[in-house]
């Protein structure tokens, strides 16, 4: 679920719509939630326990775990977003095409998944093979 939240937040950054909502697995069961207050978005598991947070300052968003320890960063670029681990090593990137589909890549440039948003505002996450793995709204 942590990976899903990371991808979710990048998608929210890309669309500028990070406010509050729920996350679901591929079967439609609720797995957690997220809520934004100012420049900070906090994530929760399905029981309401805090799992982490994201704080944005300019073009850089820093990810923290539930204890407040820095876990990595997301930096906005001209082509999308690039992610880094807590040591500053590049871990991947996200790019959005003209159709509104966001594709995620690993540090070697290999596709790892994608995100698509429908007309109702629900964003669905797919793995590299196109299989649905979760959604949020």
Positions of PLM-derived features:
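Sec/Tat signal peptide C-region and signal peptidase I cleavage site
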Residues: 16-20
């Amino acid at each position: 679920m942590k990976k899903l939240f990371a991808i979710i937040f990048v998608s929210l950054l890309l669309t500028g719509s990070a406010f509050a909502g729920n996350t679901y697995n591929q079967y439609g069961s609720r797995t957690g939630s997220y809520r934004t207050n100012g420049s900070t978005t906090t994530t929760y598991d399905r029981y309401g326990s805090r799992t982490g947070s994201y704080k944005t300052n300019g073009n850089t968003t820093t990810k923290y775990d539930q204890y407040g320890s820095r876990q990595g960063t997301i930096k906005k670029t001209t082509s999308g977003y690039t992610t880094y681990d807590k040591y500053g090593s590049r871990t991947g990137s996200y790019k959005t095409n003209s159709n509104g589909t966001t594709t995620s890549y690993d540090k070697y440039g290999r596709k790892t998944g994608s995100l698509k948003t429908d007309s109702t505002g629900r964003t669905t996450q797919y793995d590299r093979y196109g299989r649905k793995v979760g959604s949020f709204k």
